[in-house]
């Protein structure tokens, strides 16, 4: 179909004619019913990117026509903008890309894999509140693409600006630190009349991205049952567990997991956005979990920070954070260096770790803590993302280490209790339903596949509420 629209354009030798003529010819072809091109940028409005107490940058809008504010952060990732922008860890932030050209391979479809997990995104929606690029591709080309970056931003209601000096923006953020900023769309910009700067870290962002109700994923060949605490979990984290044979039950971030821990073989704490100190309920629940259970535990990113707080350590805010796909992290147990994918503005203060914990990884760029491990128990966590998406898979083996400890724990429990009834208790059965081979993926706006029965229609059952 698109070839019909292309035929309305003059031969390549005549493409030197005025852009207005080309646009007029194309619009005429559209009026006849031929499809539009893969870009929504014909007459972009003026847009302004303003850093609080800092410079003002003027460019062109290619997203939603509205004004927003948030924390301005930057990523040096060369590729993976669909994964980055859909990462719940970016909730409340305006993402500045250092890569000069963004959008050249478009935005893929919301296709799901055999377990109902999104193939190309890390959540069902665009999580960043704003997008800043030097140059946006008006034409895209990739076999998975179904729309342009501009069309995605407009559909998701996210403002975006191009044509600004991202080198100057990143230099400012690097020198002054992550700052509050806003994107204003319109020809007339008046700083005095524009909306105030809003600090997203003053609110509990995790509560906005965490699942509202527990759900279950059973790959059909399950060899272990893992409880996942959803603080804004990425799809590829769930996929990394399921593809290794784990059956998982995902709980809201503030669910009292210690109440049902004995029904699981391990606990996993996910990534998420914002200040970890906002999640005091989660910290309390993790502390109680470690007191009453010997379950293997693994945490990633925010999960690493929450586990550290539960252990008694402290967290600190970094000047401008680490957001890239090429950050070196040293494994202190083996001396090996891994190239890692990272997205965080806070870090664990390794000097405050209790005596029964030790650092696991260290950042070779800024010497910040990248992981910790318990000296005697199967508990560890990393600040970086071993599941990547995007980024390298150097450290994906950590999922194997974790699930190996889960298997050993499961076998030890079977040895101690050889006659233990493997059927779930009424409490857990009430939560999960009787038979759930398949997936229910009600994360945010995700819908349940028609072929799979729903796991939980209401947020929490009366039995579960009483137990909590």
Swiss-Prot record:
The keyword Plastid does not apply. The keyword Nucleotide-binding applies. SUPFAM superfamilies: Carbamoyl phosphate synthetase, small subunit N-terminal domain, Class I glutamine amidotransferase-like. GO terms for biological process: 'de novo' pyrimidine nucleobase biosynthetic process; glutamine metabolic process; L-arginine biosynthetic process. It comes from the Eukaryota. Belongs to the CarA family. This is Carbamoyl phosphate synthase arginine-specific small chain. It comes from Coccidioides immitis (strain RS).
């Amino acid at each position: 179909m698109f070839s019909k629209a292309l035929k309305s354009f003059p031969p390549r030798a005549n493409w030197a004619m005025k852009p207005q003529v080309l646009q007029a010819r194309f619009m005429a072809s559209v009026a006849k019913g031929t499809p539009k091109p893969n870009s929504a940028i014909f007459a972009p409005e003026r847009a302004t990117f303003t850093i609080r107490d800092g410079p003002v940058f003027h460019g062109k809008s290619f997203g939603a026509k509205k004004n927003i504010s948030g924390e301005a952060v930057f990523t040096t990732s060369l590729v993976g903008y669909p994964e980055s922008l859909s990462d719940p860890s970016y909730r409340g932030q305006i993402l500045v890309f250092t890569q000069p050209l963004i959008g050249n391979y478009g935005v893929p479809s919301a296709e799901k894999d055999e377990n109902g997990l999104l193939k190309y995104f890390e959540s069902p929606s665009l999580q960043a509140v704003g997008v800043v690029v030097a140059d946006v591709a008006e034409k895209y080309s990739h076999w998975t693409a179904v729309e342009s970056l501009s069309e995605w931003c407009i559909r998701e209601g996210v403002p975006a600006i191009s044509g600004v000096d991202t080198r100057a923006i990143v230099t400012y953020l690097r020198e002054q630190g992550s700052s509050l900023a806003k994107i204003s769309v319109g020809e007339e910009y008046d700083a005095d009349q524009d909306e105030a700067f809003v600090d997203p870290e003053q609110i509990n962002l995790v509560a906005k991205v965490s699942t509202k109700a527990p759900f279950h994923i059973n790959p059909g060949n399950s060899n272990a049952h893992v409880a996942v605490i959803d603080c804004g979990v990425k799809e590829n984290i769930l996929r990394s567990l399921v593809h290794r044979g784990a059956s998982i039950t995902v709980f809201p971030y503030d669910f009292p997991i210690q109440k049902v821990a004995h029904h699981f073989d391990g606990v996993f704490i996910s990534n998420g956005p914002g200040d970890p100190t906002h999640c005091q309920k989660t910290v309390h629940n993790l502390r109680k979990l470690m007191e009453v259970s010997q379950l293997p535990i693994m945490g990633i990113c925010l999960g690493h920070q929450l586990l550290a707080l539960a252990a008694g350590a402290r967290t600190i805010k970094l000047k401008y954070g680490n957001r890239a796909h090429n950050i070196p992290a040293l494994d202190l147990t083996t001396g090996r260096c891994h190239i890692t994918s990272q997205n965080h503005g806070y870090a664990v203060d390794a000097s405050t770790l209790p005596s029964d914990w030790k650092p696991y990884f260290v950042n070779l760029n800024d010497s910040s803590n990248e992981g910790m491990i318990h000296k005697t128990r199967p508990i560890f966590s990393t600040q970086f993302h071993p599941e990547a998406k995007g980024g390298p898979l150097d450290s994906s083996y950590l999922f194997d280490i974790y699930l190996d400890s889960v298997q050993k724990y499961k076998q030890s429990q079977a040895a101690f209790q050889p006659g233990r009834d493997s059927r779930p208790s009424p409490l857990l059965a009430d939560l999960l339903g009787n038979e759930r081979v398949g997936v229910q993926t009600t994360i945010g706006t995700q819908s349940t596949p028609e072929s799979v029965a729903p796991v939980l229609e209401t947020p929490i059952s009366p039995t579960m509420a009483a137990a909590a």
